[in-house]
Amino acid sequence: SKDNYITNKIISTSLSASDANVGQASTLDLFKLYDETSFSGYTGSYSAPTEFSRLLIAFNTTAISRSISPYAELDGFKAYLSLKDINGSQIAPKEFNTIVYPLSQSWDEGRGTDIYSFNDLGRSNWMTASYTSGAEVLWHTQGAKSEGYLDSSDIDVISSGSIAGGSSELLYSTQYFEKGHEDLFVDITTQLSATMAGFLPDQGFLIAFSGSEETDSKSRFVKRFASRHTRDPYLRPSIVIAYDDHKNDARDRLVFNTTGSLFLENKILGAYSNLLSGSNNTNMTGSDVLSVIFHTGSYAVTASGGQYDPANKYLLGVYTASVSFDRFITASVRASAGFDEHINTSGSLKIYERWMDADERVTFYTGSFN
């Protein structure tokens, strides 16, 4: 992973930090200063000198993809970019919006550490993205804020695009900070999954103040996050992956005339392992590979079972089947009594279960539940 923040902060009346690098600093500082320092020969776009910073951050998406792949497909998880606030009790701007763009071109983290005088020169910085093949590679617009459509050749950040031939969609995320001391926590599911699938360039993200909050006549100093170089590992930037793999087994709370899911877990020496087919000794994977018989008295019903795929990814050694029992079925349960009569008389009902291969030749598990 890597991170940095780039800035055009004015150091003196004739010098700015536009070519300075702070890639090894322990903080990521997001700020805007409006008309607070004079600068000789200012030729900016606004009526007064405006000083900005913008954050750059990237992660090892190959490692992330490798850790996710056993449990979830690319469309089966949620991903969040997390930056920890370290302003503490210090004054911070409030009531502002941030925007998070996917970056379009590569950039260097750099070796700079000086966030006070900005004396460490290097790339990346406000003007230059990287030093590649013996040459400076400039941002398309100073400050890395040239935005546009995916696959455009003259952009620094991607604002929209079509992923895998789908409809055009916005590819940035936003967050509102009411009090100013909140952590940044934004949904980047689309951006990350598209990056891992090869539809977005794997260059990380740019974080900036959003829209008019970069062009208005207000100063916002300083929103400070921990960088990856902070000593506390729990404060470092991260991508949080979330997916739902819980198993809500209905054996002890089945309701008549309502479908419930039952689960079968197979372990060998404590480790999850797929069932083996009795006919050819191959792993039983996918849907509809099991036949599950539920019976009591003269009543029986068969349900199809298969591997459990909570995040669109089949889980090793976990199988599920869904079933519903009709309370008013006429088949006798005991002593010629049907479900309804038996329940009213005894207050309970025992159901037997048998998990078999789809051909019903091999039994993997038998049991019962009330």
Tell me the role of every PLM-derived stretch.
Residues 1-370:
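Secreted, disulfide-rich extracellular signaling modules
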